[in-house]
From Swiss-Prot:
It comes from Exiguobacterium sibiricum (strain DSM 17290 / CCUG 55495 / CIP 109462 / JCM 13490 / 255-15). It comes from the Bacteria. Belongs to the ATPase B chain family. The gene is atpF. This is ATP synthase subunit b. One of its GO terms (cellular component) is plasma membrane. It is found in: Cell membrane. Signal peptide: none annotated. F(1)F(0) ATP synthase produces ATP from ADP in the presence of a proton or sodium gradient. F-type ATPases consist of two structural domains, F(1) containing the extramembraneous catalytic core and F(0) containing the membrane proton channel, linked together by a central stalk and a peripheral stalk. During catalysis, ATP synthesis in the catalytic domain of F(1) is coupled via a rotary mechanism of the central stalk subunits to proton translocation. Component of the F(0) channel, it forms part of the peripheral stalk, linking F(1) to F(0). F-type ATPases have 2 components, F(1) - the catalytic core - and F(0) - the membrane proton channel. F(1) has five subunits: alpha(3), beta(3), gamma(1), delta(1), epsilon(1). F(0) has three main subunits: a(1), b(2) and c(10-14). The alpha and beta chains form an alternating ring which encloses part of the gamma chain. F(1) is attached to F(0) by a central stalk formed by the gamma and epsilon chains, while a peripheral stalk is formed by the delta and b chains. It is a single-pass membrane protein. PANTHER family: ATP SYNTHASE SUBUNIT B (PTHR33445:SF1), ATP SYNTHASE SUBUNIT B', CHLOROPLASTIC (PTHR33445). HAMAP family: ATP_synth_b_bprime (MF_01398). The chain crosses the membrane at residues 16-36. The keyword Magnesium does not apply.
């Protein structure tokens, strides 16, 4: 019986120790919770809030950067479209200017050709007039020479005819003056 009693006493003591252990553990745990709340929980919560604010700030910054990038891309696209339009307009203006220059050159060539033709016509007309004048002069000289020869031969033999011809000539010249 002794053993049974001792075993029962050991169990009761063990229960008592277990209960005391449990109470001490609970008290230590509660003290630890109070200390954690006072010293660690505030800084931990503050650190988590700061981290949360930092992450939110980074997200906002990233969102703003994304929006700025979208605006920049739109601006660049607009500038690119504007540059393409300006380039197309410049090419069109250059083409029109080249066509106008070509038309102007063609017109100038046509005018110069017409002037050259007209000048050639005038030169031909002038040369023809000179040739006609020279021909008339030659014909007149030839006619005079022929008439002189005829007159010499005819008047050389007839002195009365010569005298009448000279008188007639003098009368004609006096009448025209």
């Amino acid at each position: 019986m002794n053993l049974t009693y001792r075993a029962a006493e050991g169990v009761a003591e063990s229960n008592h120790l277990l209960l005391a252990n449990m109470i001490v553990t609970i008290v230590v745990f509660l003290l630890l919770l109070i200390l954690l709340k006072k010293f660690a929980w505030g800084p931990l919560v503050n650190m988590m809030k700061a981290r949360e604010e930092h992450v939110a700030s980074e997200i906002n910054s990233a969102e703003k950067s994304r929006k700025d990038a979208e605006v920049y891309v739109e601006q660049q696209q607009a500038e690119l479209n504007k540059a393409r339009t300006e380039a197309r307009d410049l090419l069109e203006a250059s083409r029109r200017q080249a066509e106008a220059e070509q038309a102007r050159a063609m017109e100038q060539a046509r005018v110069e050709t017409e002037l050259s033709k007209e000048e050639a016509r005038r030169a031909i007309e002038r040369e023809r007039a000179e040739a006609q004048a020279a021909l008339k002069n030659d014909v007149a000289l030839q006619a005079i020479a022929a008439a002189r020869h005829v007159m010499k031969t005819q008047l050389a033999t007839d002195e009365a005819a010569q005298r009448a011809l000279v008188d007639q000539f003098l009368a004609d010249t006096k009448g025209t003056n």
